[in-house]
Design a protein with these regions (language model features):
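Alpha/beta enzyme core
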Residues: 2-212
């Protein structure tokens, strides 16, 4: 069961009701917005965060990014950052960690915050490929999908997936004279993989499978 599948069936979930109350909106308007794909409610029952609506006709929401790096990894500081973000009124938190034990960091932060929690799965997929095989480009399509599923099972409520980095977009970038071809870290991971294998981005190629 997902919020959008229930909305398309004409059913109203407790989360939709909570969002309607928070937004001072009619529940039916929220349901229709979710069904149309104009509103999302990041909610993983494993984490069960507070209900939050994002999208058309709703209040602006603030997301706070935190996370370790290979050069600086202090889990206690990330926990404190998460607490400060929540106290300051952030509506969501994202863990962008690339250093340390990523599963432990994510699990700890999920236990720390009760608001929607997001990640960028390709970070972990790429970093584990470096550890196991020596390079980001050596990760497999299965590695990418498996990491998304693994993090969802941990309780992650929403994720960034770089579906728009495709063979076509990478080829366009190669022809342009940009100072920095790609400013997105996750996008750079995908671009390197696409250039090395001369294959389509698995998240784009098998988007329906990604949604499953």
């Amino acid at each position: 069961m997902t919020q959008i599948s229930e909305a398309k069936r004409g059913r109203t979930t407790p989360q939709m009701k909570n969002v309607a109350q928070s937004e001072k909106s009619a529940v039916e308007l929220i349901r229709r917005g979710v069904a149309a794909g104009h509103i999302v409610i990041p909610f993983n029952p494993v984490h069960a965060p507070s209900s939050l609506g994002i999208g058309a006709g709703l209040r602006v929401k603030v997301n706070a990014n935190i996370g370790t790096s290979r050069e600086y990894c202090r889990l206690k500081e990330e926990v404190e950052k998460a607490k400060v973000a929540v106290a300051a009124g952030a509506h969501a938190v994202m863990d962008l960690s690339t250093g340390g034990n990523l599963d432990t960091i994510r699990r700890t932060l999920l236990q720390t915050v009760s608001i929607p929690f997001g990640t960028v799965p390709i970070y972990q997929a790429g970093i584990e490929a470096i550890k196991r095989r020596g390079s980001i480009v050596d990760m497999t399509a299965d590695d990418m999908f498996r990491t998304v599923e693994h993090q969802a099972k941990q309780g992650v409520d929403f994720a960034v997936v770089h579906v728009g980095v495709t063979l076509e977009s990478v080829e366009r970038l190669r022809k342009q004279q940009r100072c920095i071809p790609m400013v997105s870290r996750g996008g750079s991971f995908h671009m390197a993989w696409i250039l090395h294998h001369d294959q389509e981005n698995p998240f784009y190629k098998d988007f329906e499978y990604l949604l499953e």
